[in-house]
Amino acid sequence: MLKVCKFFLLTLSVSCLFSSCTKTAPQLPANKGNVVDKNISNLMEVNQKLAAKEDSILMAFATKTDAKFKKSEIGFWYKVDVPTNGELIKDKEVCKLSCTSLSLEMKVIQTETMQIVIGKKQLVVGLEEGLKLLHKGESATFIIPWYLAYGRNGKGSRIKPYTSIIYQIKLF
C-alpha cells in the first residue's frame, strides 16, 4: 500500500511539473481587431471613390465615342459591332477569338489570336464576363475599367496600375 501511495505521489508531482512548464500561447491585444477593421474600411472607401471616379470617366468616354455603348451590370461598357444569329457563348465552352487591347488614348497595347475556355479565368474578369454576352461569330468592343481588368497591379511594363482597357474582339 505504501508503494502505491509513493507511486501515486510521484506520478502526481511529475504531471504537475510538466503541466506547469508549458507556455501559454501569445494573444493579440483586445484592440488589434479594431485597427485592422478600420484599415480595411478605409481601403474599401478609397477604392470605392476611385472606382466611382473611373466610372464617370468611362461613361463620358463611351458616350463621346459611340452612343451604342451599353453599361453592363458589373460595370464594363460594351457594344456589338457585327451582330450574328449564332448561339450565345456559355461557361466551359472553348472559344477562338481575335483580341486587340488598346489604351483609352487608342494606342495598341497588344493584338493576338487565342483559344480559351470560358469560365477558366484565362482573361481579365470584365472581358470574360463580356464574352458571355456575345453570340458566336460576333465582333464587339468592350471598355473594361481597371477594377475589372488588371487592377492596382497592372501587367508588367505594358499595362500600368489603375489602367482601363479597350478590347476589340472578334469571335470565330
Each predicted region: which residue ranges?
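Sec-dependent N-terminal signal peptides
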Residues: 7-15
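Cross-family detector of peptidyl-prolyl cis-trans isomerase
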Residues: 2-6, 21-172
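C-terminal motif of bacterial Sec signal peptides marking the signal peptidase cleavage site
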Residues: 16-20
